[in-house]
Amino acid sequence: MSFTTLYSAIQGDASARALVAPSLNAELSFSELRIAIMDLQRQIASLGIKVGDPVNIAIPNGLEFVVAFYAVSWQRAICGPLNSNYKQSEFEFYIDDLKSKLVIVPEGSVAANTPAVRAAKKLSVAVAELAWCPKSRLVRIVHFEGAKINAPQPLGLPQPDDVMLVLHTSGTTGRPKVVPLTHKNLCRSIHNITTSYRLDPRDTSYVVMPLFHVHGLLCGLLSTLASGGCAVVPPKFSAHSFWKEFIQYGATWYTAVPTIHQILLRTPPPKPLPRIRFIRSCSSPLAPPVLSKLEATFRAPVLEAYAMTEASHQMTTNPLPPLVHKPHSVGKPFGVELKILDQKGNEMPQGKEGEICVRGINVTKGYLNNPAANKSSFTKDRFFRTGDEGKLDKDGYVFITGRIKELVNRGGEKISPAEIDAVLMQHPDVSEAVCFAVPDEKYGQDIQAAINPVAGKTVTPKQLHDYLEQKVAAFKIPKKFYFTDRIPKTATGKVQRRLVCDAFFNHSKAKL
């Protein structure tokens, strides 16, 4: 790895195309991108932002976000990207929790009194509006509101151990944990990603994942620019414009959650198909039938990966051809040490299930202000406990079998919801299936399922029950099925079982 801070992590030739913003009809070379970042860094420094100052970016995907993210990092400040669609109360929580000095928003936000602006004002935090200026080819602070942050500061030069990025884990229960990631963490993750997929200046990524999350940020954007390739960054994913822009800008790959893959499978593909070097899937399990259909439809290898915020995104991935990529598996560890441990910290033999634990330069040193979580989440020799249950096969491929905290304890019998999800999704009339634990008077807990049928198909609880009877033990069959055309997901497309439980079981219970 030739770089240890994001200051040096834009590696393309000066005249090569670095960034495309379709909504602005703008393309920047690497030279122009560096100039724009440095110019915005000067503007941020003039506002008084100094080393260690937290800055929130509440801007949708696009050129302004990219330039702002790098500018904040170059100034040695701490970046806290936020979903621009949050409600005011959500903005208040994250801005206050980070103790932000500045909230960066799109042009027009103050006049529109957007939720981010209202939250910042309530907390007496300064607001800066950004806009792309085509004539100067720079991103400018076009409006500033709030108290003076500090005296103008000199330009910073980031150091490897500077905390650069702070993200909150969505978690399955309780208050979100705060994950600090350093320049060194991020750069090691970038190195792992670029090496595992052999990214180079000939590649162009089409970024469909939000940049306020590590999936889109680390893999889609930062790794592309660090390899000298080009990133195409639309404001959000749109099935209508995906193929048009993918072809127009010469994209060679994309990374997404299974939800987006399935939407693209339902969208008529272009004729002829563009050459796609590979498709990456991450952040949620990809059903093997969907993987097979993706490969057959788009004539490209589909590589499933495994990632977490605490590891600056990627921990394992299936390899590119001609090496084997295995359905059901999230591949091999790449750039990290990985062990399967029991509850006492003993390493499990090959093929036996236990907790997936990882260690590496990309892994955070610990959560902020949370000694209890740090004690329970790291082993004595600093392996991070992912909370995921899994096993290794004889070839060293990782298979995730469930989430430890999500295991259903039905009268002493442990059920993995992920296992039943996978079986249900093999049914020809099931598009999505999410199983979850519910309280039960007799067994303590039982399992129920939310089902999204294939469009135009109808499936009954009895049909699903009969189907599962042939596949799994009787105690694993969900007690009840809920049918819907929309499974609740987080803003990044992840399924959280507690959200599904709230939407179906708790909602139906409240009606009683």
Curated annotation (Swiss-Prot):
UniProt-listed CDD domains: FACL_fum10p_like
UniProt motif FACS: location: 381-429
Motif (Microbody targeting signal): 510-512
Broadest EC class assigned to this enzyme: ligase
EC number assigned by the record: 6.2.1.8
GO biological process, one term: fatty acid metabolic process
Membrane topology of this protein: Peripheral membrane protein
Keywords for this protein: ATP-binding, Ligase, Membrane, Nucleotide-binding, Peroxisome, Phosphoprotein
UniProt keyword annotation of NAD present: no
GO cellular component labels: cytosol; peroxisomal matrix; peroxisomal membrane
Chain positions with Phosphoserine modification: 283-284
Binding site for ATP: 168-179
GO MF term list: ATP binding; ATP hydrolysis activity; medium-chain fatty acid-CoA ligase activity; oxalate-CoA ligase activity
Subcellular location: Peroxisome matrix; Peroxisome membrane
Catalyzed reaction equations: oxalate + ATP + CoA = oxalyl-CoA + AMP + diphosphate
Chief location bin: other
Described function: Catalyzes the first step in a degradation pathway of oxalate to CO(2) to protect the cell against the harmful effects of oxalate derived from endogenous processes or an environmental sources.
Family: Belongs to the ATP-dependent AMP-binding enzyme family.
Domain notes: The FACS motif is required for catalytic activity and substrate specificity.
Protein name as annotated: Oxalate--CoA ligase
Gene that specifies this protein: pcs60
